[in-house]
Amino acid sequence: MQKILIGMLRTYQGSCLVNGIECKNRTKNFYENIGVDFEFSTMYEKLTARENLQFFSSLYEKKPRPIDELLEAVGLEQDADKRVADYSKGMKSRLNFIKALLHDPVLLCLDEPTSGLDPANSRMMKNMILEEKAKGKTILLTTHNMQDAAELCDRVAFIVNGKICALDSPHNLIMSKGAATVTYTWVENGEHRASCPLEQISSDERLKNLIAKNRLQSIHSSEPTLNDIFMDVTGRTLL
């Protein structure tokens, strides 16, 4: 899908419009409003980060965003003049991301943007994505990370064998799985476990009796996640 949207795949059935332009009939200015962040680095390894960004910004007619500000935003200002070949995978991912922001596009196509990042940099990346979203930009996120999808997306589509099998907001998809449940354990000639829907907890006589007699060993609640929806829709687990 992303290959069609960014004009890489020109042979397809049906219609696909980006900013009112049919993708197969793209013009010279088609990419002025599209930013693409592939999962794997598309940088020139022998150039520095700064040189790469200067080169790619020169390909657009629009005035680029300040390179130093973008580098600082992803924590690469101290390594701006280091060759990309010497960057770690996470550093390349961050550099790839800000390359997509250089020309301030209205459409961002992001492919696994947090892949290879530690928790701190992953959080930073997601905050930047949310900032771009708050500006009114359209963001197409391709990911197997269901936590990212739940945090970042207004709508989530599960695509199986080229077909959309489910499409809705993260909240609605999760609620379609069912309500949260409460699981509790107690000891009586061995350990026992039972569960009940959260909204029915007040009518669970066994649970009320265990609490009254101070015999409850543990209790916790859980609710469905997008991982559960993924497994239901696709019939397979996430790796």
What are these regions (language model features)?
Residues 172-239:
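Short, charged/small-residue-rich alpha-helical element at the C-terminal edge
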Residues 37, 56, 128, 162, ...:
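Short, low-complexity, polar/charged sequence segments that are solvent-exposed and flexible
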Residues 165-173:
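Charged, amphipathic alpha-helical segments
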Residues 1-141, 146-160, 166:
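ABC transporter nucleotide-binding domains
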